[in-house]
Amino acid sequence: MDRQDYVIEVSHVSKSFKDNKVLKDVSLLCESGKIYGLVGHNGSGKTVLFKSICGFLSCDEGTISVNGKVMGKDKDMLNEAGIIIEEPGFLRTWSGYHNLEFLYTLRNKKNKKHLYSVLEEVGLDPRLKRPVGKYSLGMRQRLAIAQAIMEDPGILILDEPMNGLDKNGVKEIRELLLKMKEENKLIILASHNREDIDVLCDEVYEMEGGVLRRL
């Protein structure tokens, strides 16, 4: 495969916080229509790598390119990405639907009826009036996934997407992610649950001490 066919290219990236080097010469190539899994202990550098790919952190060394454009030179290029890295700051007194509607409107999107199908796709009732502050952890996680997919992104960056979900919820979200893969989406996910990784992922990488290696 030619390098221009890769959607995300991480090339020799290093990142330090003071004297702590958390990413060490990391390289990764990702293409559409695949799910990439990232495993590793807490503090191994997974979240820092995700934040760097999403443009939330700059690299000390190396480059990250998305669709051929180098991160840092084009701030808008990840608008097509759906991201779960930390729990979104939903307005706790609003319903799930109204939270999504507010974000959708901010992004100048018009077809709000589309949000009903998005919520149903992640297993939430769009007519539910309950404020997000009274949602269970699993319901909040479903809402976070709905936010990530509501604009039909070509790229999904998901840190522990199954967190807080019960057995049925895990099954539903796995099926959703596999469906999105079939739609030629690129998905990168981190999980401590090896079963999620084994069921979903085409390629698996381990982060240990800031070093990335393929398993």
What are these regions (language model features)?
Residues 54:
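Helix-to-loop junction immediately C-terminal to a conserved catalytic motif
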